[in-house]
C-alpha cells in the first residue's frame, strides 16, 4: 500500500484492508465519482467500485461486457436501462448481468445514489466491452453515437470536459451511514 495526496493506493499483491472513506476517489463529471480500491496494478480477476452519482449522473455509457457484472444500490434511486428496457431501482435492489447483457445505471433526477458495482474481468479488445447505440439510454445521456469497442471514443465528450487529474480524496457525506 502506498500513500498519495488523495488517499492510500494498493500497488502490490496480497491481502489488504482499506476504508472507502480513506481511499482515493476518481471524479468523473457526469459519471459521478467512484472508488475502485486499485492502483496501477488492477485486480486480475474481479473489479469492484463504489459509485456515488449525483442526480441524473450515470455509471458509464450503455454497454455490454463478456464477463458478468453485479450491481447493488446502497442508497438513493436509479434507473436501470437493460436490454433497451427501463427498470426503477431503489436501495438494496440487486442487478445481475450475465455476460453480453446490455445495461447502464443512471441516478434518478433530483436524487443522488450510491451503487456498488462488481464484475469479472473481461477478455478481448477493451476488456471485452462493447458500447452500444440505444434510444432508451440516449434519453438519459448514456448512449454512444456509434457502436464501438474503444473507450476513448465512447467517453470522448466526458474526458474532454474533465480536468487533467481527476483523482481526489473522499468527499465527506458521499457515502451513507448504514
Residue locations for each model-derived region?
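Short acidic-glycine-tyrosine-enriched beta hairpin
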Residues: 70, 84-100
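Short, conserved beta-strand element in jelly-roll/cupin
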Residues: 45-55, 63-81, 118-122
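Short beta-strand segments
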Residues: 59, 82-87, 129
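Conserved, surface-exposed functional patches that form binding/active-site neighborhoods
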Residues: 122-141
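Conserved short histidine dyad/triad with adjacent acidic residue
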Residues: 28-36, 49-65, 99
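Ligand-binding loop in jelly-roll beta-barrel domains
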Residues: 79, 99-126
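A short, N-terminal "cap"/entry segment at the start of jelly-roll beta-barrel domains
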Residues: 1-45, 136-178
Amino acid at each position: 500500500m502506498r500513500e498519495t495526496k488523495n488517499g492510500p493506493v494498493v500497488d502490490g499483491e496480497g491481502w489488504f484492508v482499506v476504508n472507502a472513506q480513506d481511499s482515493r476517489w476518481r471524479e468523473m463529471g457526469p459519471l459521478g465519482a467512484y472508488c475502485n480500491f486499485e492502483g496501477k496494478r488492477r485486480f486480475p480477476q474481479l473489479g469492484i467500485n463504489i459509485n456515488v452519482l449525483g442526480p441524473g449522473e450515470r455509471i458509464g455509457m450503455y454497454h455490454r461486457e463478456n464477463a458478468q457484472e453485479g450491481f447493488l444500490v446502497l442508497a438513493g434511486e436509479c434507473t436501470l436501462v437493460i436490454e433497451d428496457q427501463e427498470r426503477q431501482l431503489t436501495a438494496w435492489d440487486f442487478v445481475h448481468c450475465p455476460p453480453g447483457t446490455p445495461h447502464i445505471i443512471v441516478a434518478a433526477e433530483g436524487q443522488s445514489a450510491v451503487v456498488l458495482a462488481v464484475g469479472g474481468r473481461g477478455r478481448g479488445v477493451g476488456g471485452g466491452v462493447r458500447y452500444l447505440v440505444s434510444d432508451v439510454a440516449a434519453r438519459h445521456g448514456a448512449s454512444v453515437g456509434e457502436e464501438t469497442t474503444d473507450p476513448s471514443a465512447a467517453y470522448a465528450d466526458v474526458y474532454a470536459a474533465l480536468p487533467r487529474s481527476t483523482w481526489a480524496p473522499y468527499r465527506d457525506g458521499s457515502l451513507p451511514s448504514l
